[in-house]
Design a protein with these regions (language model features):
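Short amphipathic alpha-helical interaction patches enriched in hydrophobic/aromatic residues
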Residues: 9, 81-85
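Post-HExxH zinc-binding segment in Zn-dependent metallohydrolases
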Residues: 89-121
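Active-site His/Glu-centered metal-binding helix of metallohydrolases
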Residues: 73-82, 95
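Metal-dependent phosphohydrolase cores
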Residues: 28, 77-80, 108
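Auxiliary, metal-adjacent structural segments of Zn-dependent hydrolase domains
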Residues: 2-59, 64-66, 113-121
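Aromatic side chains
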Residues: 52, 78-80, 99
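Short pre-active-site segment immediately N-terminal to the catalytic Zn-binding motif
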Residues: 57-73, 86-91
Length: 121
């Protein structure tokens, strides 16, 4: 994983390029790229910003504004990653949060240094 990978992923999401970020994540972790769609599946609470559906490998988002939310995109990608690797989707909320926060913290650290994160694109 290149040094600026995590900050780059967050930057892409903030820049409205969530699909490109998901492609890079999938390539890096050697898994398929999940589909991304706006609109939660029936039965999901409107208070959830996103959810991952293993059947169909789809990340569903509450609305289009969430497309630029790195925490939600990365959190749901973690569920895709776990489901792809070990077929488990239970008890992973804390780890999904941790995964997302790790990327966001790396982005913040690069931003504090004044680095041009987007140069990796």
């Amino acid at each position: 994983m290149q040094a600026n990978f995590k900050p780059l992923i967050v930057w892409l999401i903030l820049d409205g390029q969530a699909e490109k970020a998901l492609n890079l994540l999938a390539k890096n972790y050697k898994v398929s790229t999940p589909k991304l769609k706006v609109g939660l599946p029936k039965g999901h609470k409107a208070k959830a910003f996103g959810c991952y559906t293993p059947k169909g490998s789809t990340i569903s988002l509450l609305n289009s504004d969430i497309m630029k939310n790195p925490f939600v995109i990365l959190h749901e990608f973690y569920h895709h990653l776990r489901t792809t690797v070990d077929k488990k989707h239970k008890g992973t909320e804390k780890n999904a949060d941790k995964f997302a926060i790790e990327f966001i913290e790396a982005y913040k650290a690069e931003s504090r240094k004044g680095s041009q994160v987007s140069q990796g694109v």
